[in-house]
Amino acid sequence: MKKKLSLVLCFIFAIGLLSGCAISPEPITPDTASGLWDKIFVLPLASFITLLYNLLNHNLGFAIILATAIIRGALMPLYSKSNKSMAIMQEIQPKMQRIQKKYENKKDQASQIKMQQEMMALYKEYNYNPMTSCLTPLLQMPVFLAFYQAISRHPLIQDAAAAEFFGINLGSTGTVPNYILAFVVAGLTVYSQRLMNKNMKANMNGQNNQTSDMMMKVMTYYFPFAMFSITIGTPFAFGLYFLTGSIMTIIQSFIFKRPAAKK
């Protein structure tokens, strides 16, 4: 659980760092793409957005929304697996703590080996893999950063005609539409975090866990503020990514609510 919290905190740090980052003035194209990151993540994603743009009657806003929905939908099974693993972890947490307490004052190598063996036996009994519960934060980081760069560096963002979406310039920052979208995104983020926290507490079966409580508080109070700040300071198009992602998260919470609650 502590490892998962560390990953979440790293993701939050990246979001905070991004909120103060300047947008790269260099459009992403096959000629300007440099390094593995650009060639493997940013350029293919930007090209995918361009493909959808051409299919959707040259509407860049809808192309970004659809690209976000498709990629988030494709990753949903992995998110589901991570959430189920997290639910199992919450269920076996008391047994894990009892094992740790049993060997709390036994620091010799033999005792530590026995503790690890008991832990592994517990994991095997519940078919639990600690790394699986870390899939969500591990996946979110590269997807988040790739989308940011693919959108902010997309050649069409700098084209005033192509970047118009219902009269709004998708490349605009700090404008009234950005603030309006920021409030909507922050509101949806608050709602989605409450849903996830509710599901997490249900999986804990009334048991309190200090690390879980800390993670829920961090997610609940910091994420909406971070989303609000970034939506204002980045292109309006990136706010559409947040908007779609928040809606997908809410849908995901409802889809996987029942299986998690039965644990």
Model-derived features with residue positions:
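Helix-loop-helix
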Residues: K2-F13, L17-K263
